[in-house]
Curated annotation (Swiss-Prot):
GO terms for cellular component: acetyl-CoA carboxylase complex; chloroplast stroma. It catalyses: N(6)-carboxybiotinyl-L-lysyl-[protein] + acetyl-CoA = N(6)-biotinyl-L-lysyl-[protein] + malonyl-CoA. SUPFAM superfamilies: ClpP/crotonase. Its EC number is 2.1.3.15. This is Acetyl-coenzyme A carboxylase carboxyl transferase subunit beta, chloroplastic. Its cofactor is Zn(2+). Binds 1 zinc ion per subunit. Component of the acetyl coenzyme A carboxylase (ACC) complex. Biotin carboxylase (BC) catalyzes the carboxylation of biotin on its carrier protein (BCCP) and then the CO(2) group is transferred by the transcarboxylase to acetyl-CoA to form malonyl-CoA. It holds the Pfam family Carboxyl_trans. One of its GO terms (biological process) is malonyl-CoA biosynthetic process. Keywords: ATP-binding, Chloroplast, Fatty acid biosynthesis, Fatty acid metabolism, Lipid biosynthesis, Lipid metabolism, Metal-binding, Nucleotide-binding, Plastid, Transferase, Zinc, Zinc-finger. A zinc finger (C4-type) spans 232-254. It comes from the Eukaryota. The gene is accD.
Amino acid sequence: MEKWWFNSMLYKGKLEYRCGLSKSIDRFGNPIEKTSVSEDPVRNDTDKKIHSWSESSSYSNATHFVGVRDVRNFISDDTFLVRDSNRNIYSIYFDITNQIFEIDNDPSLLSERESSFFSYRTYAYLKNGSKNDDPPCDRSMYDTKYSWNNHITSCINSYLGSQICIESSILSSSDNSSDSYISSYIYGESRNSNERGSSSIRTSRNGIDFTRRENSTDFDLTQKYRHLWVQCENCYGLNYKKLLKSKMNICDQCGYHLKMSSSDRIELSIDPGTWDPMDEDMVSLDPIEFHSEEEPYKDRIDSYQRKTGLTDAVQTGTGRLNGIPIAIGVMDFQFMGGSMGSVVGEKITRLIEYATNQFLPLILVCASGGARMQEGSLSLMQMAKISAALYDYQSHKKLFYVSILTSPTTGGVTASFGMLGDIIIAEPNAYIAFAGKRVIEQTLNKIVPEGSQAAEYLFHKGLFDPIVPRNPLKGVLSELFKLHAFFPLN
């Protein structure tokens, strides 16, 4: 039988793995070799594999140590398949991020339950580290789904307690109530998902069979917990939503810059208490009475206004950046894809004119899918109107305009004010283009190479100036303004 062997113990509230596989069990569950115990938390031999156990009780001498840092990889959205000599399969599904644990309850899988599934050593035996003859393996502890669930529950509970911020009401309760909370949460979900069916993709890694299970309820779970977690669109890792804002919406796992709302960007860039918004009451009136077979344009505008709390896809106003007075406009991709309609164009134009009259430096943060098709030529006209206002600001008044391109910046915004900055800054891995990949391929009947519209590729083509991550962005802008003779008032 192919097996993942591990023993665990709770020590000072954290989960530690100490004992690996160096033991074989015959078909009647009798130990035939000693299990070594090591205090070394480092994995000694990562290249060794656990081989199939034949009828003659052959064994492998592979030791796998799993430290706290490796727990995430060991129990993170994977299904471990255990196959016995009769080709029966017993699967264990982990999803630590959504707190899901499933064991297939197929009678054919449980028929070989009498053979030992896992070797277990109690905490006292691990603590003593006895080198004498091993005591008989207590197979009754893990020959039922219930006892195995209890063991995994304690592992998951300990891991959550040491690695994830659990609500204080859970942590402050007793061990029993905490176990009960986790148990009911995990197994309640697993029972429901088992009833609704699933599909799986079978893979093999290092000689051991794995199955990545895709439940039909995955989408429902994502929707259910999206108020708690934000999924990275690059590595698909989950980031805790409460902590994401303090980390500037940067993925913990891969450092990818996730989308930010316009309000969060303003809070990031502008000194506290200095933000003064402009034209907040300006709304679109469906100027061309756009006909839609689905949702009417006015209803769609109202829906996005309720969803985002904004009147349209841009916020404009004045404030101070490290004490320097500035005018700033920030587009919001959450409002109809940041599309540029008549209201967006008018608000940006008024902001530029105000900055021109007040001799203020200007920042425009771009995040847009382009012109808004529901407003037709009026939307396209905003490109020329904004560009004309910028020409007066830059060429006649000799003032300083910084354009910041975030992901995505496409269409009419790229073709107008997005590329007119005196300094054009891009965020890492930002998607920047005029036409999207699919549109180009369908129009020209040519394949667009992957990554050819990413900021790092376009930087080497000279499309913009620096690529600046969010962390130092405010300091970089402050230095640029000082270089162009804009200084703090205090």
